[in-house]
Amino acid sequence: MLRPFDYLYILATIAFTVYGQLILKWRIAQMGPLPTNAVGKVSFLISLLFDPLIASGFAAALVASFAWMAAMTKFELSHAYPFMSMNFVFVLLLSGWLLNEPITFQKVFGVALIVLGTVVASSG
């Protein structure tokens, strides 16, 4: 029997996934562009791996994975997975607000189509 509390596992999966994406983009943008030469690229990427905020993004992905595994003990995949489309909504809105990325009509329309398609697919 499902309890409303069980949906917290799905919510945690979404929250930690969105956090991970936003913190990675924010921190990488602060560190500058990827160098053009091979040695510079490798050095840059290795430095990213040891950045504490980047590490927190990876840790968030790990926590999201654990939350998803917990959700899978409570829900059928076909019921739970459509909720993951909310990642698109939250990343779009929060990247506009926190990262000052443009929120264009095309992006909003595209995300709306994804959510609508998810609702249609999960209701059948």
Segments from the language model and where they lie:
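Loop-to-transmembrane-helix transition segments
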Residues: 6-12, 43-63
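Hydrophobic residues within alpha-helical transmembrane segments
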Residues: 12, 59, 85-89, 108-112
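Hydrophobic transmembrane alpha-helices of multi-pass small-molecule transport proteins
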Residues: 106-123
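Hydrophobic/aromatic residues within transmembrane alpha-helices
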Residues: 27, 71, 97-99
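Hydrophobic/small/kink-forming positions within alpha-helical transmembrane segments
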Residues: 14, 18, 62, 88-93, ...
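Structural motif at transmembrane-helix junctions in multi-pass transporters
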Residues: 66-86
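Glycine-/small-residue-enriched transmembrane alpha-helix faces in small-molecule transporters
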Residues: 1-30
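C-terminal transmembrane-helix exit sites in multi-pass transporters
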Residues: 89-107
